[in-house]
């Protein structure tokens, strides 16, 4: 009887942790919504892996190569926790949108020619990358932490959003903050830094040229 009980308990534990794989077809863009945690993993195939317990709380739609991932759980948790998470395996990825408190991250380099990142409403993107060009925008308290290498880039932080790119090696970069945004940035050749209506741009490293423009307040700082 005890052996039977242990077997039943073991099966329940196994089933509760079983993973489900979804073949969503090829995609090069992703959009995440509503406090969901998404790990990006480079792969030879495109797929989404999730826990079976989360399957009923996640909607996945691939429309014209743009994969939308949404948490449909009505009872959302605190800002420091995520009840629903998925792993996204991708072949090529050049655009990431994080919305409504979602969290997107990678532990391995995302390699592409051009990368576009957008985050809003308290969302977070933490990405390691190797690219030629990046466009990154944050709004409404969203944050980004970017690491790796990019030849050129355009970074924009609005309305309390923040971009930490001091560990992303640029040759040339444009950094613009509006209405209380914050950007930490590093480049070897040129930084074009602009502040409007408050906010700060903090410049790391020793770029050869720094072009500063301030309108209606804000700070541009050289960090040694």
Where are these regions (language model features)?
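Intrinsically disordered, low-complexity terminal regions
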Residues: 1-224
